[in-house]
């Protein structure tokens, strides 16, 4: 019956029921427009359908786009409503994600990915845990000079991780992801939010945090690059040290000990022989991507020579096509890229209009006022604000949108309730990256790695929640002590 219908009846019914309940039964709160409330109903229904696997996520997204267009929640004019529903397909972030996946195919096709994987194994391959730490440290080394966390985690580290997993025949298509691919994919991803929190230049929205903090405090607090890096150094390193161990405990790989891995890797490298033409071109393009993503031209020659992260991705893909390393058929066959572009665009669109229609602003103001009247002191109030701010990211498909919508209101509320400005600024700044752990649509890196198929949706969300708790605890406890020692509050 499920095959004939094209959807699973029970999860589809639950998703529809939730949407109808919010739309028709729960009254529209004061201060919220009917359009915003109805869009929330659809958003909740879509997320429920995705979680319940009522249909493939891309198919659900097509239906979501149709519903936004036909209900007219964003515009009374049908043509404008359709434009709104498709608006995120023009988002540079969406295409950065998709093109990063396409580029990673070149690393695998040429064999360069396997070569890098074997080199990693020869050095760190005695234990799977050691390979996990090597991926995390690679992320950390790249983070200060890679402003796109999607490019870093999805375009640079992820192909290497896939190559290592493949070398142990850990492949989702073969049902062998549990050997080590699942664990390594989770380490690959959860390195990303931690390193993003450690440097202003590690993810695009961090400068926005700096700007909001400065404006809210009338420039009394300005988080410079060095101040931010020093503040996040100790808690960040502690989080990086804990993360592979925590994931190892909850998602232990089937292959734990690899005592012969170094010799095995050397044999494989010998079998590969000298680098092929394709590998050399791929390596050169890889270097070009890294240089441009790191913003080296702008550093050397000024802002006029800055290259956008998505433009960089298209440069890389264009060079791969021109050189013949990848063909257009290769691009067309990269189903996960096209699937990711579709579903991520739909979710970003819905989250964007929840913000534009004022629902997120209403929610932030309501929560801030409610906490203020509890009379629980600045510590309790700040804790509630921090938790509400971070876990509200379940409703967002963009960290930039989330920070824009909520950071200022929540930070101002914390200051009004007596929170030390520098302490609360650093905690909120850390939470702005830690919240990326939560879902498979939380940031650009998540759909790239989740789309590789190493984990189920339930496993991804469970790991995300666990790591959000661990990371937040580390930054609150270690951070608070470290920042006190530095005299920040």
How would you name each of these model-derived features?
Residues 91-101, 146-156, 228-244, 423-435:
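Alpha-helical transmembrane segments
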Residues 28, 59-172, 334, 338-417:
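Membrane-embedded alpha-helical segments and adjacent helix-loop junctions characteristic
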């Amino acid at each position: 019956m499920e095959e004939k219908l094209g959807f699973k009846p029970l999860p589809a019914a639950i998703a529809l029921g939730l949407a109808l309940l919010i739309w028709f039964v729960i009254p529209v709160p004061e201060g919220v427009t009917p359009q915003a409330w109805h869009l929330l109903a659809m958003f909740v229904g879509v997320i429920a359908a995705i979680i319940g696997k009522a249909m493939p996520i891309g198919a659900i997204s097509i239906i979501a786009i149709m519903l936004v267009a036909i209900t007219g929640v964003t515009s009374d004019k049908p043509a404008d409503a359709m434009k709104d529903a498709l608006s995120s397909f023009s988002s540079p972030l969406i295409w950065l994600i998709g093109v990063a996946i396409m580029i990673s195919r070149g690393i695998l096709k040429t064999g360069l990915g396997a070569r890098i994987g074997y080199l990693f194994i020869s050095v760190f391959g005695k234990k799977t845990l050691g390979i996990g730490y090597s991926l995390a440290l690679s992320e950390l080394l790249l983070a200060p000079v890679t402003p796109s966390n999607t490019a870093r985690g999805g375009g640079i580290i992820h192909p290497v991780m896939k190559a290592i997993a493949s070398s142990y025949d850990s492949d989702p298509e073969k049902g062998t992801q549990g050997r080590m691919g699942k664990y390594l994919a989770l380490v690959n991803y959860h390195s990303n939010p931690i390193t993003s929190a450690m440097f202003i230049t590690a993810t695009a929205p961090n400068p926005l945090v700096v700007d909001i903090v400065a404006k809210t405090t009338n420039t009394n607090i300005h988080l410079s690059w060095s101040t931010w890096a020093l503040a996040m150094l100790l808690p960040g390193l502690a989080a990086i040290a804990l993360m592979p161990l925590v994931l190892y405990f909850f998602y232990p790989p089937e292959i734990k000990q690899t005592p012969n891995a170094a010799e095995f890797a050397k044999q494989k490298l010998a079998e590969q022989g000298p680098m092929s033409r394709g590998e050399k071109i791929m390596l050169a393009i890889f270097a070009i991507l890294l240089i441009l993503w790191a913003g080296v031209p702008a550093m050397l020659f000024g802002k006029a020579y800055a290259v956008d992260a998505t433009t960089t991705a298209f440069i890389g893909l264009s060079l791969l096509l021109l050189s013949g390393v990848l063909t257009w058929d290769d691009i067309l066959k990269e189903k996960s890229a096209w699937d990711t572009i579709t579903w991520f665009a739909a979710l970003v669109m819905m989250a964007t209009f929840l913000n534009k229609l004022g629902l997120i602003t209403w929610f932030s103001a309501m929560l801030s006022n409610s906490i203020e009247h509890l009379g629980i002191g600045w510590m309790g109030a700040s804790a509630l604000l921090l938790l509400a701010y971070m876990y509200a990211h379940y409703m967002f498909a963009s960290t930039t949108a989330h920070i824009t919508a909520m950071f200022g209101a929540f930070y101002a509320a914390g200051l009004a309730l007596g929170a030390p400005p520098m302490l609360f600024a650093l905690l909120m700044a850390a939470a702005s990256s830690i919240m990326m752990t939560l879902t498979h649509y939380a940031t650009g890196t998540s759909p790239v790695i989740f789309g590789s198929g190493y984990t189920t949706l339930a496993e991804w969300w469970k790991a995300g929640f666990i790591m959000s708790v661990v990371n937040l605890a580390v930054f609150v406890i270690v951070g608070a002590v470290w920042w006190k020692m530095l005299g920040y509050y």
